[in-house]
């Protein structure tokens, strides 16, 4: 039977137990488990006098992969705003931290820009880049300031057999904290013995201290199938692919039941997202869409490389079409950022993809000149004319010079000069292979 007073007493005891004032970091996803955890911590600390509450930093960290289910992202963002406002009004020590992947780690930059195939269980390149790295960076930055940190997680043993085994593997008998994989970091799972039924019982009976309605959360769950999206800080923690509220682009699972259910329950504006996700799923294992040579230049029977240039351009086109479609109902929603579009073009240049341009695809769909600059285009035309005059006897020389200039420019824009000489050498070798008979 759920004993709320016991759980709150445990939290208060742990709050006072530490002499070194190490920070608390609460993993918050907006789902049922992390909501219950934050409510318990909030109500426990609120019983202290104001000066005691401020004795340690308490962070509420929420990671946005930038490809979250948009319905859930909108809900979570509103909740985080309420938490920030209520914490300030009530004199609580909570600080909301929103983390996102670095530009070079975003989903679209890797899939469209570098041509990485849609993730599967064998090549799940997304989890570390989108989830683990942003959260880990914040935790390590916090540890460097406070010496140590305690990571409070809403994980429960009855969520899955694997989760239970992992929790028991690291816990110590008679101790609340267990060593985390990150240095000087401890994990604390106050809800580890709480059942799913008890979570719902608590949320129905205990009002949100930041003024939200838990019934809104229940409505979200009633429109899809169960599970929660945990804070992912290591590869042993199941990512959202096996839970209900995951990334809308996730192809690790065969079918996105949550998005399908949301569409069936009236969120028809999300249909373009589901169709795009299904396109990624069918393209993953076909050499029609993927190169036969890998990015490192090796070629082996039974193995495939990145997406072919034409399909990368096709995916970008479909992403932008989906964005145009959903903005009819949700005008503030964006599936891909302007920074990602610019970076994708740079990566295409680095992969010697010159037949497709991001700006052409964007402007065709949105009937816009947003990504064009008249002065820049005029300068490029003048440079092209000069190059044509100088290299009028050899069109191959023009292509080589353009390719090498683009490679150098891409390195400067990405602030990564490492590998420039190798890229230039590869370009020269490819050029010589074409003109020198073997």
Residues of each region from the PLM?
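Nucleotide-activated chemistry modules centered on ATP-dependent adenylation/adenylyltransferase
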Residues: 1-25, 32-438
């Amino acid at each position: 039977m759920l004993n709320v007073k016991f759980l709150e007493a445990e939290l208060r005891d742990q709050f006072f137990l530490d002499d070194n004032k190490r920070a608390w970091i609460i993993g918050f996803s907006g789902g049922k488990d992390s909501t219950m955890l934050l409510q318990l911590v909030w109500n426990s600390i609120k019983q202290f006098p104001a000066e005691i509450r401020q004795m340690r930093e308490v962070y509420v960290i929420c990671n946005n992969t930038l490809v979250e289910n948009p319905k859930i992202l909108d809900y979570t963002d509103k909740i985080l705003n309420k938490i920030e406002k209520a914490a300030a009004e009530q004199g609580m020590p909570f600080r909301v931290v929103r983390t996102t992947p670095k530009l070079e780690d975003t989903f679209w930059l890797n899939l469209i820009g570098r041509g990485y195939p849609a993730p599967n269980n064998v090549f799940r390149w997304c989890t570390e880049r989108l989830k683990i790295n942003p959260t880990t960076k914040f935790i390590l930055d916090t540890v460097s300031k406070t010496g140590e940190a305690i990571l409070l997680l809403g994980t429960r043993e009855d969520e899955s057999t694997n989760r239970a085994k992992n929790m028991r593997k690291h816990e110590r008998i008679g101790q609340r904290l267990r060593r985390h994989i990150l240095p000087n970091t401890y994990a604390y799972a106050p809800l580890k013995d709480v059942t799913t039924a008890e979570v719902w019982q608590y949320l129905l009976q205990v009002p949100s201290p930041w003024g939200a309605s838990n019934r809104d959360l229940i409505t979200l769950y009633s429109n899809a199938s169960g599970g929660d999206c945990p804070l992912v800080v290591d590869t042993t923690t199941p990512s959202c692919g096996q839970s209900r509220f995951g990334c809308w682009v996730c192809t690790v699972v065969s079918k996105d039941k949550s998005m399908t259910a949301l569409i069936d329950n009236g969120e028809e504006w999300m249909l373009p997202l589901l169709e795009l996700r299904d396109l990624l799923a069918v393209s993953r294992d076909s050499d029609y869409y993927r190169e036969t040579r890998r990015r490192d230049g090796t070629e082996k029977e039974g193995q495939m490389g990145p997406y072919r240039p034409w399909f990368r351009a096709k995916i970008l086109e479909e992403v932008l079409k989906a964005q145009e479609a959903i903005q009819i109902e949700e005008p503030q929603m964006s599936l891909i950022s302007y920074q990602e579009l610019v970076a994708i073009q740079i990566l295409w240049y680095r992969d010697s993809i010159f037949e497709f341009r991001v700006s052409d695809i964007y402007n065709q769909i949105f009937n816009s000149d947003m990504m064009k600059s008249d002065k820049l285009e005029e300068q490029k035309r003048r440079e092209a004319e000069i190059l044509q005059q100088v290299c009028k006897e050899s069109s191959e020389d023009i292509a080589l010079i353009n390719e090498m200039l683009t490679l150098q420019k891409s390195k400067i824009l990405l602030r990564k000069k490492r590998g420039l000489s190798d890229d230039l050498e590869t370009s020269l070798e490819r050029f010589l292979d074409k003109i020198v008979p073997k």
